[in-house]
Amino acid sequence: MSSEMLPAFSETCNVERQKNLSEDGEQNQKPGSSERFQPISKRQMKKLMKQKQWEEQRELRKQKRKEKRKRKQLERQCQPESNSDGSDRKRIRRDVVHSPLRLIIDCSFDSLMVLKDIKKLHKQIQRCYAENRRALHPVQFYLTSHGGQLKKNMDENDKGWVNWKDIHIKPEHYSEFIQKEDLIYLTSDSPNILKELDESKAYVIGGLVDHNHHKGLTYKQASDHGIDHAQLPLGNFVKMNSRKVLAVNHVFEIILEYLETRDWQEAFFTILPQRKGAVPTDQACESCSHDKKFARVEGGLNSDSSEEENRHELDSTHEEEKQDKENSTESTVNSVPH
C-alpha cells in the first residue's frame, strides 16, 4: 500500500468506527433497554412470585370450586323427602332471633382518611355485613353518613352493595333520625366501662381507620354532642400485648358474639385475632405473682448464701488470728533462756 493511500484508508476506518459507536449509542438509548437490565427489588420479586403462584393454582382453585358444588349437590340429594319442600330451611331460619339492638357504623370521618384506609374500612364493613347475615341474633345494622370516598370506592369495587339486605344505608348523620338519649358511642377513650348491652339502645362504632393519628377523636365528638359513651369491658377480661384499639369489624363481631353467649370473656377470645396476644386477666395475674415469688425466693437464696460466705470468711479470719497469736507466744517462750 502506497503512502498516498494511507491517509484515505485511516479516514475510512475512523468513519466506520464512529458509525458503529453511534449505532451502539442509539441501541442503548432505545426505550426499555435500560429497564431490561434494572435490578428487581425484593418487594417486586415477592409480588412476581405471588402472581406466578396465583396463576399456577388457578386450575386447582377451579377444581376445588367444582368439587364443592358437587358436594353440596349430593348433600341436598341425600336430604329426606319430607324436607324437599324446604321445611328444614324454614326450621333453621326460625332459630334466628333478630335483636332490636341498633348497631351503627359512623362513616362521617371520610375526609380524615387516605384512599388506602378507605379501602380497609370498606373491607371491614363487608365483614360486618356478612357476619350479621349469618348470626343467630342479628342486629339492626346501620351505615350512616355514607358518601364521599367510601361510596365511590364501593361503587367501583363492590357494585352489589346496593342489593344488600337487612341493612340501613343512609347518607344522613345518625343524630338526624335517632334520639340522643338512645345513643351510646363506643370508644376506647371513654372512662365508662360497659357491663352489659341494653338492646333498646343504639350503639355507635366510629368508622375510622387512622393508625392512631386522631387519638381521642370519637370520644371528643361524643362529648361535644352530649352523647353517652362507653368502652367494651376489655380490660376486665383480657390482657393484651398491643393497644386496646380494635378494628371496626372486631367490635361489631364481639357484640354479635355477646348477644349469642352473654359472656364477655368468651366473646373476646372467640373474636380477637391471635396476633393481639390476648390472655385472660386471671392467668396474667397468676403469671405476674409467680414471677414475683420466684424472684423473691431466688433473691432470698442469694442473700442466704452471701451471709453464709460472710460467716465463713469471719470464722477463717478469727482462726488465722488465733493461730498467729499462739505461734507468737510459742516463739517467745522458746526464746527465754532456761
Swiss-Prot record:
EC numbers for this chain: 2.1.1.221
GO cellular component, one term: cytosol
Keywords assigned by UniProt, alphabetized: Coiled coil, Methyltransferase, Nucleus, Phosphoprotein, S-adenosyl-L-methionine, Transferase
Coiled coil: 52-80
Biased composition (Basic and acidic residues): 308-328
Catalytic activity: guanosine(9) in tRNA + S-adenosyl-L-methionine = N(1)-methylguanosine(9) in tRNA + S-adenosyl-L-homocysteine + H(+)
Protein name: tRNA methyltransferase 10 homolog A
Organism expressing this protein natively: Bos taurus
Lineage: Eukaryota, Metazoa, Chordata, Craniata, Vertebrata
